Every structure is written in structure tokens, then in C-alpha cells.
Amino acid sequence: TDDMYMEITEEETRADCRDLLLASIPLFEFPNEVIDITTNKDGEDVFTRNLTLEEQNILGMGMVQIWIQRQMSSIEVTRQKFSGADFKLTSQASHLKQLTALMTNVKDEYRRMLMIYSRHEIKDGKWKSTFGNMVKRMS
């Protein structure tokens, strides 16, 4: 876990989560409709349209990916301050190894979610495969 969130205010936490969300939007390849954020009359950040639960999950997984990358970068800076042998003895080395494995799993799951998202559409409340749009009979 990230102890930083225990040390910062709720406003700072919300700002950081907003940054993670904004960074995750470009990772979302080919959404069915544009995903954008605007500020409403109350000064709150809101999406310009309603997102499906699937789109929310994809953005959330993108936020996790960005957060893990941030953690890995922080540990990498620590590694650069120590010599190779000294770093291997620290718990940071073990933590980096675990984060690397977690990042691989998160990226795989994120790609799977995007793949499923791109292969269907919802019509009249039912999921419909778009496979026919990808594979067309040659005439």
C-alpha cells in the first residue's frame, strides 16, 4: 500500500486520484464514445457523458497501472542511489520484484478488458458480438 495517502489531506488525495484518472484516459484505446472530463457549475469534475460500468472498470484498471508504475519509478530512484549489491539486500528490491509481477498481471488484465470491450456492443440491453464487423466475406 502507499503510506503517502495516510499523510496527505483528503483534498490532496482527491487531486492525486484525479491525476491518475486523467492519465488513464489516454490508455483507453478506442472507446465507443469520447471520454472527457469537464467542470460543472458547482466546480466539480464530471464526465461529459455517462460511462458504462465496463468503461469505469477499464479506467479504474488504467489508474491502477499508472499508480504501480509510479511506485516502481520511485523504487528505481532508490535503487540508483545504492550500488547493485547494497540494493539487493534491501526490502525495496523485494518490493520492486513484487510490483513488477503485479504490473505484468495488471497489464494483462487491462489488455483483456480492452479486447472484450472492443468485441461487443450493447443493443436493447443485450450484448451483441461485433465479430461480423471484423470478418467480412470477400465478394
Residue ranges and their predicted role:
Residues 1-51, 112, 116-139:
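Conserved short "hinge" loops at termini or chain/domain junctions
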Residues 15-93, 107:
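Divalent metal-cofactor coordination and adjacent catalytic microenvironments
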Residues 91-124:
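Polybasic, proline/glycine-rich intrinsically disordered low-complexity segments
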